[in-house]
Amino acid sequence: MSRRILVTGATGYVGGRLAPRLVEAGHRVRALARDPGRLRDAAWAGDVEIVQGDLEVLADVRRAVEGVDVVFHLVHAMSAGGDWAQAELVQAQHVAAAAKAAGVQRIVYLAGLHPQGQRLSKHLASRVAVGETLLASGVPTIVLEAGIVIGSGSASFEMIRHLTEVLPYMPAPRWVRNFVQPIAIRDVLHYLVAAAEVPGDVHGAFDIGGPDVLRYGQVMNGYAVEAGLPQRPIAPLPVLTPWLASQWVNLVTPVPRAIAMPLIGSLLHDCVVEEHRIDRVIPPPEGGLTGYRGAVRLALARERSGDIESSWRSASSAGAPSDPLPSDPKWSGSTVMEDARERVTSASPEAVWRVVESIGGDRGWYSVPLLWSIRGLADRLVGGVGLRRGRRDPVRLRAGDVVDFWRVERIDHGRLLRLRAEMRVPGRAWIEFTVEPAQLESGGSGARYRQRAIFLPSGLGGRLYWWSLVPAHHVIFEVMANRIVAAAEAEAR
């Protein structure tokens, strides 16, 4: 049955993945956003009604719920700073009042697993307070209390990812030994989509979690195994308060302190499924719930397949729910190291492309020959291929061709060449060249040349490798850009 659905938090991690799946299920979706421009690049933006509004303004909420059957409340304000818990409560009160007045038939809220009868962290206590406010609204409400959500872009998953990749050993405050029950984002979306059509007499809070109950330390080491990293030994610590831990997380990872602190606070408790009443309301997905390691594999699938573009946040919502989206936070996803150069030249795009396509082999790399030769020798000394392979053809390339210790991953003749490194490095590396027409300041026409070296480091060793080479990269890639452009200009003369 098609329903009219309002999604709050559509610019967020879960909302941005839920909205297109509700559309796919045949529902008519309205997305509420304070800044509708943030949804402009969403692949599904043309399939939904986007309305501007602020949940802290009751009149905005009343307009948003007009004519709606179901409200999905997916806004969490912990990244906003200040008294975010009070802001979340006010927003929930507005949603509850407006939904009741408008005759909304169902509210669905995504909260967090928490123990009963214990003093909770601010993060979990806020989730409980919001859920209770919505349950008391007089509108049939389902509160889904989820474990740690596993998928690229999820704040909890990104903290696991970055801590595991950066730390050679695992500091072990008490909460590293606490139990959690992670759940794959695909399974969270299964429950959310199904909740839109649950009979109206269903009302209450329901635990949802994956099939695995793990200590947080096991969660980090499970990620390490799936990411191809060594398991991290545990180093006991005498004391590490949530505040100190959040400072430390902020120092060694890109996860903002404002997000790290409430997440760490929630780890002070065992957060596991205590009842399975959800199975009587919404059956598990066909094939069963996804295990933790399987969820991590799904989250890393794009990166493992070599689809570097997804790591540059160009993935569309049509992909798997565990894939990254352009709307995910900038600190989410794999760490990407990059050296980018750009030049505008009077040479024609065709002339620049001819130089680019002939790179490597006997012509070399238009850079500092000594440094390039040293890199090739170093690769051979550790069992790599070095520079000895050359290239199949001196002037033409095709996908799959070898170019010294690179391989052509993608080529759009006349426009783009992307080479994937096959040298021995602690991570994965690419170099990409693009050429396009450009207007010169003098009024004539020429070409714009862009050059990017990209590195996805593996663990702390990969990061140290890149940082140690930054001075050499500055010389190598600066000279390369200058000489490629100069060669194209010389050819044109």
Feature locations, PLM:
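SDR active-site strand-loop-helix element
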Residues: T8, L32, L74-V75, I107-G112, ...
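Mid/C-terminal beta-alpha module of Rossmann-like enzyme folds, strongest
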Residues: A195-P262, D270-R341, S348
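NAD(P)H-binding glycine-rich loop region in Rossmannoid oxidoreductase-like domains
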Residues: G37-A102, G112-G117
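Glycine-rich portal/gate segments that line the openings of hydrophobic small-molecule binding cavities
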Residues: V336, V344-W353, E357-R428, Q439-S442, ...
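Beta-strand/loop substructures that line and gate deep hydrophobic ligand-binding cavities in soluble
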Residues: A421-V475
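N-terminal Rossmann NAD(P)H-binding glycine-rich loop of SDR-like oxidoreductase domains
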Residues: R3-H27
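Conserved glycine-rich Rossmann-like NAD(P)H-binding loop of the short-chain dehydrogenase/reductase
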Residues: H27-R34
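Oxidoreductase cofactor-interface core, primarily capturing Rossmann-like NAD(P)-dependent enzymes
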Residues: L18, A25, A42, G117-A227, ...
